[in-house]
C-alpha cells in the first residue's frame, strides 16, 4: 500500500468469499455468498477503491476422495468437473471476481507445504495421536461435550469414533493473544452476535490443540517431511487468502500480497465463522502476519423453513432460477431477501411476487412510462423547462438522501437495506408521476415547459437510481441508462441533481425490462420440471457403468431340510443403543409380529442407533440365544458386505408388515 499521503492512487480493498467445497453443484444458498460479495466489490469500486476480489474452490479431503471413488473417477478428475460447474455458475451470475483460486493449484500446494514445515520448525506444530469423534462431511473432530444431541454441532450428522497418528497445532499458545485482539478490535467479527458466540462458546472455555494432518485418506497435500500425512483441510483451505496474492513464507512475497494484505473483508457463511475467527487468525499470528480487518458471517438463505440441502429435497439451483427469471432478477431476489443478521427465506411464490411488484411494476413500468411519455409529448427530447414546483424539491431531496443512505448501508454491509434505499428512489418517482399528472399537463399548451421539467426530473432521478443500481443489477442498470441515452453517473457526482444533458433524446423503442409473471403458470412449469427430474433418475441409474461383482469362497452344499430349519421374518426396529463394552456392537429391540426380540449386531461402524430406529429389516428369528459382549442376542439381522467391508442391512423392497415371512 502506498504510504505517500499526497499520492492520488486508489486505496486498496481486498474482499474474499469462502472457497466453495467441490463435493457437488452449488445451490442458490451457496450462490448467494458470491453475489453478495460481488455487490460489495462493485460498490467499493464505485467508491474509488482499488478492489481485489477473490473466490475459488476447496478441493481436498476425505469426502471428495469417497465421492470420486463412488463416481469411478480420480479425485482430480472429480474436482476438475465440479470446479468447472462452480465457475460456470459464478460467471452466469455476472460476478466480477479478479482471482479464482483452486487449492489444487501447484503454487498453492507448494506454499501450504512450506507453511506447514515453517510452523513445525517453530514448534507450533507437533506430532501426536488423535482419538475423538469425527464428522466426515465437515471433516472435523469433536469432543463428546461439543456434540449437540450426540451429533455434529455444525451439520447435525452422525459422528464416528476415530483414532490416528496426527500433527497438532498449539492453539492454546495463542488463545490469550487472540482474545485480547478481539476485545481491542470490536469490528473484527461481525455481526456482534457471532463475536459473542465465538468468545463464549470456544475462546473463554479454553482452546484445544487442533489436528492439522490426516493419515486415513490420501487426497490432500502431503506433509513433505512425513508424506504418509496429508495436510488437514483448514490449514490447506484457509491459506488460500494469502497464497492467492502470492504470499511466500520464505519472504519472497509477490506485489499483490504487499499491496492488498491484510484483507479488508472475509465474507463467509455463519456456519464456518469459527474457523475464520479462531483458527485462521491464530495461524496468521504464528506466521507473523497481520490479521484480516473484518470477518463477516452472513446468515443462510433458506428454502421454505429450512437450510437447503440435497438430502432434504429442497434445493434450488441458480441456473434453474435464471432460466425462469433472468440473472438480474435472481440477483435481486437473493440480495433483497437476506437480512443483515437473521436467515432469509426464498420461495417460488415470493420470487414471482417480487418479480411482479418490485421489478416489473415499481422499476420496469416506471422506466417504460417515462420514456413513452417523453416520446409522446416531445418526440423523445428531454429538456429542463425551468418551471419548478415544491414537489420537485421533495423529489430531489428524496433522491439525494437515498443515495447517502444507500452508501451508509453499504459501509455497514447492510446490502438488503441499501437496495431498499435505491428502490425508494423509484417509488418516489412513481409517486411524483401521480402528483404531477403529466397527461393532464399535456392537455394545456401553457404547461408545456412545466411538463418538460417534470419529465426531465424523472429522467434525472431514474439516471441516478439506475447508476446506483449497477452494483446489484449490473445488466439492468446498463439497459436503463442505454434507453435513457444517459451516461452512468459516478457516485461522487450523486450529490448533485440536474446533470442529465438538457436536449438529449431517449430511445424511441423502449424495451420491457421485466415482464409480469403468472404464479399458476410458473408453478405448473416447476411441477413439470420436478416430474421430469424424477423420471430421469431411474434412467440415470440404468446408464451407470456395470457395478463390480464379488466372488466368495463357496461353502459346502446343504440339503433343503437343513435350510428349512431357518425361520426368516420381517422385523421393525423400535429401539436401538450402542453396547457400552464394545466398539462394534449395537443392541436393537426388534418387533416381529406380536413379539419383540433383542438382537445384537456388529454394525456400529456402519449405522448409528438413531438411523436404525424405524427400519424394516430381514431377521433370522430362530437362532439359539447367545451373549455377545455380555448382552443377550435372540436372532440375527441379515446384511450384505462389499469388498471393502462396508455393510448394508437387507430390507424389503416393498412395504411389508412386521412379522411377514421371508420365503
Predicted regions mapped to residue ranges:
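Short secondary-structure capping/junction motifs at helix and strand boundaries
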Residues: 93-102, 120-133, 145-146, 160-163, ...
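Phosphate-backbone binding interfaces of nucleic-acid-interacting proteins
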Residues: 541-663
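N-terminal catalytic cores of NTP/NDP-binding nucleotidyl/phosphoryl-transfer enzymes
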Residues: 2-82, 101-116, 121, 138, ...
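Helix-rich, typically C-terminal accessory recognition domains appended to large enzymatic cores
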Residues: 127, 350-387, 398-506, 620
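Intrinsic disorder at enzyme termini
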Residues: 477-562
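Cys/His-rich short segments
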Residues: 122-175, 179
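A glycine-rich helix N-cap at a beta->alpha junction
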Residues: 82-98
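Structured secondary-structure scaffolds
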Residues: 2-55, 107-111, 161-376, 418-422
